[in-house]
Amino acid sequence: MIDNRLAPYGAFILRVALGVMYLAHSLVLKLYVFTLAGNAQFFGSIGLPAWFGYAVFFAEAIGGALLVLGVYARPVALALVPVLVGAAWVHWGNGWVFSSPDGGWEYPVFLVVASLAVALVGEGAYALKPTPPALVTRFARA
């Protein structure tokens, strides 16, 4: 049984941890380690348009910040799922374990699940701008 007194804090921890992960992957890896130009070049090297590298950077950076702040976390988490599905696709041939050479697909798939969990359970405690109830109701009926 879910403890309704503590559940908002569990959702808060999940939301913030997921947001920090997106921020780390965008700002640390894509901006400082690989650089934006290098990231775009990588996307081009795997047969995708190079501009996808910039789009993914901005999606992760903006989405991560919105998740940490708790601004419309449900739709933001759902909108970020395709980014991680794409990451899983890129790493698929490397095997399951993320510590494999060039990274496996386990971590991106886990983050897809975590993003879906945030989309389902909501922002939790300390959200600056929770998802409007009308949007949640519409989402639940879909």
Question: Over which residues does each language-model region extend?
Answer:
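Membrane-interface interhelical connector segments
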Residues: 31-47
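Extended, low-polarity transmembrane helix blocks
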Residues: 1-31, 50-58, 62, 68-142
